[in-house]
Structure formats: C-alpha cells, structure tokens
C-alpha cells in the first residue's frame, strides 16, 4: 500500500512523472480517471487553501468527496485515533487526506487503513504536497533547469512543516539552500544560515520563499509585535529592487509582515500560480496513489 506521508515517499523519477501529469492537468478540464471513487478529507486543523485544493483536485478527477466535520466528529468527544481510523476504514474510501496538529498522526492512520493516506500537513513534521507544488512551480519557471539554483527560505523555519518538507525535497534536486530567520526561528542545520535579511542575500538568490510566522506553535511570546519581526524579515521592494528572481509563499500571507503589499502585486510574486499548480499536483498525486493501489 502506497501512502504520501513525506516527500521521501516518492523517488525522483516518480516526482518527474507527477510533474508531467500535473502539467497536463493545468488546463483545468474535468477528467474521469477517478469516476466512481470516493475520497475522504478529515482536517483536525483549520484550513482553507489546502482543503479546497484537495477537494477541487478530487472533483476534477471525477471522484466523490466526503468532508468529515471534525468539530462534530467522535474524535472531538474522546474517540481514540485507532477507533477513528477503524471507522474511516469501514467506510471503504479509496483515499483519505488528513491534516493534524500533532506530528505523526497521518502515519499512524496509514498503518490501520486499507487505502492510501495523503498527509495534508502534520504538526511541524511535513507537508509533502506543498513541497511538491513549490518545486513544480520552480521547475516550470526555470524550464527544468533547477540544479544549483539559489533559494533563500525566510521566516519561522523551525516551526514550519512547509520548510521541513521543502528542505528535504529541494536538497534532493540539488538546489542551493540558504535559511534566513531570527535565532529562535532557526533550526539546527548544516545549511547556510543568516539571522537578518539584507540586500546581499537577495542579490544572490534566484528564489525567495517567505514563510508565515507560526504564532500558534509558539510556547511564549517572541515579539512584542509582528511589526518588529517585519522590520527585519518582510520581503519589500526596497530590498528586492530589480533583481531577477521569483517570490513564493505557501499562504496565508500576512501582508506587510511576510511580504509587502507592493511585492504582492509584483509580477515576480508567484503565490497565485502556486495555488493553481497545487490543484494540478494534488490531482496527479491522488490519481497515482488510487490507481496504483487498485491496479
């Protein structure tokens, strides 16, 4: 049984096959690959973009979508994770997409399911489809020439599952990664790191990936105000200038904290392209896992 718990679950050849399939899906035309199939989404954390993206992907492939309302589910009434898995499995879905605040939950569910489980984000651990869509966006922009491209990841890296998944995946494709964050947001790492964003760092980057400050994962107040954080880490036109690069963000963007209003409207900012690419990548992932499982 194949699952997608981390980006490591797909090798480089498989990822390139996903990219080829996703490129075809960018036309947004409905397909029937998963006609008659059922996909269950169960998100224990709030989500707009990721949940909507997965559900759009499933429907464009012809699948039915069952969204479980966690606030009203038995899990909110004390049901164990094992019982939740057993009940989900009894519904005989063809795939389950799960998001949870605790790292490891998708893997635990996968051990008890008879269908593919896709991790829609678990704690600080992983967000594999976000990393795949980010690399897909980079790959398309540079027409496949990504090896050696310099990417600067800026923000709350230590608490970000997006950063964790991207660092693993981008390293496999030999991108040159630099991390920029205040000391309390910087993980232990062998990668190049800086504690303040400046013009020189941006001038030496092909890609900037800005991250949201994960205030919900902080045990204590780090900044008196997010504006204090923005003074050192907000991506602004005055820093970027006319540098030829692309700017990414997994969303939601805290405007004028993560990225300035001016840069959000800049043609180098590909946030909306990431959203479009995300649906296509998730279509490719769902198709691959479900059809391989039943093949």
Curated annotation (Swiss-Prot):
Its EC number is 2.1.3.2. It comes from the Bacteria. SUPFAM superfamilies: Aspartate/ornithine carbamoyltransferase. It holds the Pfam family OTCace_N. The keyword Iron does not apply. Pathway: Pyrimidine metabolism; UMP biosynthesis via de novo pathway; (S)-dihydroorotate from bicarbonate: step 2/3. One of its GO terms (biological process) is amino acid metabolic process. It is an enzyme of class 2 (transferase). InterPro entries: Asp/Orn_carbamoyltranf_P-bd (IPR006132), Asp/Orn_carbamoylTrfase (IPR006130), Asp/Orn_carbamoylTrfase_sf (IPR036901), Asp_carbamoyltransf (IPR002082), Asp_carbamoyltransf_Asp/Orn-bd (IPR006131). GO terms for cellular component: cytosol. Carbamoyl phosphate binds at residues 49-50, 99, 127, 130, 251-252. It catalyses: carbamoyl phosphate + L-aspartate = N-carbamoyl-L-aspartate + phosphate + H(+). Keywords: Pyrimidine biosynthesis, Transferase. GO terms for molecular function: amino acid binding; aspartate carbamoyltransferase activity. L-aspartate binds at residues 77, 161, 212. Belongs to the aspartate/ornithine carbamoyltransferase superfamily. ATCase family. Heterododecamer (2C3:3R2) of six catalytic PyrB chains organized as two trimers (C3), and six regulatory PyrI chains organized as three dimers (R2). Catalyzes the condensation of carbamoyl phosphate and aspartate to form carbamoyl aspartate and inorganic phosphate, the committed step in the de novo pyrimidine nucleotide biosynthesis pathway. This is Aspartate carbamoyltransferase catalytic subunit. It comes from Campylobacter jejuni subsp. jejuni serotype O:23/36 (strain 81-176). The gene is pyrB.
